[in-house]
Amino acid sequence: MVLSLGELLWDMLPSGKRAGGAPVNFIYHSVHNGADGYAISAVGEDELGDELVAATKNAGINAIIQRNAWPTGTVDVQLKNGIPEYTIVRGVAWDHILYTRQLINEVEKADAVCFGTLGLRSPESHDTIIELLKHTKPGAMKFFDINIRGDHYSKELIDELLRTATVFKLNDAELLLLRDMFNIRGTSDDEACRWFLNEYGLDYVILTAGSTFSTIVSKTGESSTVDTPHVEVEDTVGAGDSFSGTFTAKILNGASLTEAHRAAVNVAAFVCTQSGGWPTYPDVVPDYLAEAESNK
């Protein structure tokens, strides 16, 4: 069983609102790739909260959603000269996830737990999630998908979560930021990933570089690098989360590093061809990698 901990929210787009949140996206794609799972979050006792609970159910996402007196999470998206600017509203329901016996019981059963920096930006949810992660069973995957957003992070938080994690995922822009933050100089991207692997005793470090490539290094010395296949992009919402969810589900079901990596790349490419982070899956996800390789 796979769990995610953190934000559940509405993106308030100029065209209307869209349900999302990286941890919930992660569960959606884990479940579509062979895992059972739950998203754990909180929404307000308000109309937006009612609608968000309904949206997760309609998408087939199993979730343990606390209700509290804080407003349901939103992200205000404004277009400035055609470029979206995001304001992740503070002081919302998912900033106040309560530490409960029900959540402890779920975490104790989990084979993998996913979390990121945003879901721990507030003291209450930070303390809840950190305490819950202490209850994972031996050998459970603790997947830290850094997902840096705005100024909702600190070096102290990233270091704390790296010490908790067994898997660390970041993108090329986040690696640039972390090189400066951790004073990692004069090394290749692969060497920088291995620095995190060794410094924090991780099982895997995953680096994604958008439309270019992705690479995974492991504590066994095995690694996998895959060029990103070219697809007609509708939007990239949830693509990184779909990569994480697919990789986790495949590894838990016994896939090799290379098999899990290729599956994750294909799913992320598929998600980019669709609108939104919770697309309807086809019977079989296209093998974009095999197609690209056959055309070389």
Question: How would you label these PLM feature ranges?
Answer:
Residues 11-83, 90-94, 289-294:
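Substrate-binding N-lobe of the ribokinase-like
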Residues 1-3, 55-57, 61-65, 83-223, ...:
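Ribokinase/PfkB-type carbohydrate-kinase core domain
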Residues 9-12, 149, 174-176, 231-232:
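A short, flexible beta-alpha/helix-coil linker loop
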Residues 17-21, 47, 71, 98, ...:
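Residues at secondary-structure transition points
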Residues 186-296:
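Conserved phosphate-binding/catalytic region of the ribokinase-like
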Residues 1-14:
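Positively charged, low-complexity intrinsically disordered leader regions
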Residues 30, 171, 240:
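Short, conserved phosphate/pyrophosphate- and ester-handling motifs at nucleotide-, phospho-/glycolipid
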Residues 21, 73, 94, 117-119, ...:
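Glycine-rich phosphate/pyrophosphate-binding beta-alpha loops
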